[in-house]
Amino acid sequence: WVFHLNSGSCNGCEIEIVATLMPRYDPERFGIKLVGSPKHADVILVTGPVTKKMADRVKRTYEQVPDPKVVMCIGTCGESGGVFYDSYSLAGPIDDVIPVDVYVSGCPPRPEAIIHGVVKALAKLERLEAAP
């Protein structure tokens, strides 16, 4: 199950995430289902660069997800700050705040890329669950 967290994006990635959830792509066949609470999630989808105001919230959200967990960085802004990289209000890319397991590049990434990333994240989650 997947929890989405916007850490300061322009909403381009969110539009593509919504497109990914449409019947055309049917992500539930892969076990992809959005949940409203990080306490019920296995995977965190984080979009956007982390603003200074969101840095603590991102950390708290990460801590609320039960182990094992996988973090996905969706979009170029989350990877490097994107067009906002030199903004005074940024804490930095996502991996400066929490560990990231899967990166999905693009501005914004296509739904197919997001699905591919989630499938990779679920495979990693299965490996983590199988580990002693």
Where do the protein language model's features map onto the residues?
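Iron-sulfur-associated redox domains of electron-transfer enzymes in respiratory
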Residues: W1-P132
